[in-house]
């Protein structure tokens, strides 16, 4: 079955926009009638992805971040896209506690949190070409599965 609804949002990569973006994504997912816990999980994962883009992708240079969201039946999909410096070693970057900015007191837990709160997380990136974090979460139970 195809996508039943989509939303895209583009904004400046500024820390003051992180809260706006996570609330916009939360508002979009409400059409699936998620639990408060599911909404909190999504907001946390999106927040981590946006923060990674701002700090690591752009190093606080306020270029654009795009978020694409979609719902299909009871599944929620969100992509957080930046056009920053990219990730040279995705596997290493996704290791818990790995950080490229230890002097900034970064814990290196962003991807670990995304993986903990979402059902699937996949990262696409090339150095100097940006990064796409694809995330998916199943919301509740698909009542159509029993028909």
Predicted regions mapped to residue ranges:
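Short, charged, low-hydrophobicity "junction" segments
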Residues: 20-23, 69
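Conserved polar catalytic motif of the HATPase_c/GHKL fold
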Residues: 48-52
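Conserved beta-strand-loop-beta-strand hairpin that lines the nucleotide-binding pocket
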Residues: 1-8, 53-147
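A short, mixed-charge helix-start or loop-turn motif at secondary-structure junctions
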Residues: 6-10, 32-35
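Conserved short strand/loop->alpha-helix "switch" segment adjacent to the catalytic nucleotide/phosphoryl-transfer site
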Residues: 22-47, 106
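STAS-typified acidic loop motif
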Residues: 8-20
């Amino acid at each position: 079955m195809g996508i039943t609804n989509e939303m895209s949002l583009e904004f400046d990569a500024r820390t003051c926009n992180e809260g706006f973006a996570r609330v916009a994504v939360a508002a979009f997912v409400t059409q699936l009638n998620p639990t408060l816990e599911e909404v909190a999980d999504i907001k946390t994962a999106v927040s981590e992805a946006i923060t990674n883009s701002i700090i690591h992708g752009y190093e606080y240079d306020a270029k654009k971040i795009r978020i694409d969201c979609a719902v299909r039946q009871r599944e929620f999909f969100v992509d957080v896209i930046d056009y920053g410096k990219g990730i040279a070693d995705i596997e290493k970057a996704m290791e818990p506690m790995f950080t490229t900015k230890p002097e900034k007191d970064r814990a290196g837990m962003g991807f670990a949190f995304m993986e903990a709160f979402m059902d699937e997380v996949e990262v696409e990136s090339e150095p100097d070409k940006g990064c796409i974090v694809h995330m998916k979460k199943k919301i509740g139970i698909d009542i159509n599965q029993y028909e």
